[in-house]
Amino acid sequence: QMVKAATFMNGKQMGETLELQLTWNKATAKPLLGNRKNEMLLVNGLRGSLKYTDFEWCNWNRNDSISFTIDLLGKEKLNKFAIGCITNYGMGAHKPKMIRVEVSDDNKTYRAVGELNFSLEEIYKEGTFRNDYSMDMGGVSARYVRVTAKGAGICPDSHVRPGQEARVYFDEVIIE
C-alpha cells in the first residue's frame, strides 16, 4: 500500500511528494516487549533502504544478544517468519551469527519454531545489500513471537575494519 504526503502553503505544494510503501502483515503495528526505544521500527510497516541511516533500521552493537517479543494480541496461525537485515561491509554492518524464533501462548513458556545460523564467510561477505531471512513456522498457533539473535562478533583481520565490533541492523519483521 502506497502512502503519499506533501506540504502545502497557501494552496501551493512546497517541495516533493513523499511516497512511502507500507507492508502489512500479522506483526505490523503490534506491541513489542523489548528494551530498546527504536524497536518499534521492526513492526511499523516500512522497509529500510540500502542506507542504514534512513531511520528505518533498528541496530545493535557490542556483540549484543538481541531479543524482542511481538505480542500479536491474540492467538494467530503462523506460517512464515521473515526479518530484513542489511549488510554494509565498509561500515562493519553485518548479519548476526544466529537468529532464533520461538512462540508462546502465555509469554512464559516458549517453544522453538526454528533457527538460522550463518558461517563467518556468510556474515562477512563484501558488499552493500539487504536480505530477508525467513523460516517456515509450520502453521503453529501462538500469541507471542520471540526473536533472539546473536551479534556477528569482531570483524576479522582481513576486514576493512579489523578488530571493530560488527553491528546488526534489522528493519522489519514479517509474519504471515
Predicted regions and their residues:
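Aromatic, loop-rich ligand-recognition surfaces of beta-strand-rich domains
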Residues: 50-114, 129-176
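Short glycine-/Asp-/Thr-/Trp-enriched loop segments that recur within the blades
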Residues: 124-128
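Short, compositionally stereotyped local motifs that mark structural "simplifiers"
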Residues: 1-67, 86
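Solvent-exposed serine/threonine-rich low-complexity stretches and specific carbohydrate-binding patches
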Residues: 112-123
